[in-house]
Amino acid sequence: MKGLIIDMNYYEEIKNELIDVEVYNTVKEYSKNRYTSEKYYNVGKMIIEAQGGEERAKYGDGLIKEYAVKLVKEVDKKYDITTLKRIRQFYLMIQKGATMWHQLSWSHYRELLPINNINMINYYINICINQSLSVRDLKEKIKNKEYDRLTNETKLKLATKEDITLMDNIKNPIVIKNKYDTNIISEKMLKELILDNIETFMNELGEGFCYIGNEYKIKLGVVYNYIDILLYNIKYNCYVVVELKVTELKKEHIGQIQVYMNYIDENVKTIYQDKTIGIIVAKHNNKYVIRYSSNPKVVCTEFELV
């Protein structure tokens, strides 16, 4: 009998929190999602406590079922057992170390709940905040396995909160939407696909990129050369030369992009900007070519057509 009284006390607190959510949502449309997240955190905590703690909560949902039956009748039909389980899972996710959780909406968190890796969750939370991602944008990034396409070194840096370089943020492979009926494409076709979705391409490279131009003309002696794509990164304060290759990376590709980088450094960059970065987007990487390249500011990443 005593246990039942305690459970009902928790139930009344949970009910009041959820009623607050429903009332608030009718008058504070602009901020209701964040308010909902905060209230659901409180509800999740009370559910765990009512079940006797996290360990005991793993072995049964009888109490949640009882709560759900009453809440559906007394508050709103959306508070069924599935929703209450999500709310409980949300609380546990925060307890495991999800950061800055109060800055996202409940709609965002519903997409993150199926993820078990807390480092992956924090990665997506951070990019949602930094890039002001919609729920649709977040779903797309999760679907494209953006976190999985980071290097292990970058994942370790993120987990230990070390400083991240521009090159750490580059995904491998870069995902590019293909409008053609074939996966065998020319460099011209590859460039067209990228320019059709330049914002998506820059997001694949990381944060802070701005588009300057394509076929950027430079003059080497009496001969004109053309940089495939020239970008600028405002976060890292440097120009970024992008060269596209539909073959495996070759040593001459390194030499070519280094010439372009040196030109930008000498003729375009100011003394207040950092040295130019070079990114080669190739069909296949060659780790030995990169390994023995003398320039640490050159990186190669592969592309994948989807």
List each language-model region with its residue ranges.
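Basic, low-complexity intrinsically disordered segments
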Residues: 1-306
